[in-house]
Amino acid sequence: MGKTISIKVLFGIYLLLMAGKVFAFSCNVDGGSSIGAGTTSVYVNLDPVIQPGQNLVVDLSQHISCWNDYGGWYDTDHINLVQGSAFAGSLQSYKGSLYWNNVTYPFPLTTNTNVLDIGDKTPMPLPLKLYITPVGAAGGVVIKAGEVIARIHMYKIATLGSGNPRNFTWNIISNNNVVMPTGGCTVDSRNVTVDLPDFPGSAEIPLGVYCSSEQKLSFYLSGATTDSSRQVFANTAPDATKASGVGVTLMRNGKILATGENVSLGTVNKSKVPLGLSATYGQTGNKVSAGTVQSVIGVTFIYE
């Protein structure tokens, strides 16, 4: 009988030791429950930031933290990101860079990263940021809420014994609809609605542009016009409410702009440069009748 009890006690100790090893390394997302391995969704509010030579997609140090359950650097965990980590969804065809543990790597990853050591019980935010490389002038790609924008693979192994290796995959998912800037320059709004006061009033157009590095930019207007000078944009309001004899003109520094006319903005950098545009009515006939005036006008930016 004593022998049987002794065997059960030893067996119980063995199980406890194994359980302790299984939970020696953990992570969480946004302070949630502990994650020991496998695939986890990381929901992020995307707020792209233009930076010199690159556009910040997301700072994941604000979301993912990991720690060593033993603490005291007794059995240190060694963490690295794994080749094959890449953008996904609407960003799948783009290239960028990944910041990890004081080193920046081309992204998608074609090699494993350096190793981050974690040996403390205090959750450590992972030093991890994603950037997209600008590919031209002002441009962007629409990302929808719920879309996976990147998959990052992570490997962990400890110092003692077999190291209890683990694999993690972080699926980075957008919480919001956003236009991700993919160009060296971008505008502060891609769809601007301007309400004009009653005829013959005017209104400022709140539109500006900024760039990740210094660029000489110009822009031009496009859209259907009604006059030979290409300065009065057509009234596209529904016929039932449409005003007659009037369209819309855009002005800059007191000068009416024509479609296709290049307007230089000079050198643009990270500080927003307002386009300085205002909208007003443009008369197209001798007589103006009351009604709705509506025009759709495009603004295209080009490198000088």
From Swiss-Prot:
Residues 1-26 form the signal peptide. InterPro entries: Adhesion_dom_fimbrial_sf, Adhesion_dom_sf, Bact_Fimbrial_Adh_Pro, FimH_man-bd. It is found in: Fimbrium. One of its GO terms (cellular component) is pilus. Disulfide bonds: none annotated. The keyword Signal applies. Keywords: Fimbrium, Signal. It comes from the Bacteria. Pfam families: FimH_man-bind (PF09160). GO terms for biological process: cell adhesion involved in single-species biofilm formation. The keyword Signal applies. Belongs to the fimbrial protein family. This is Uncharacterized fimbrial-like protein YdeQ.
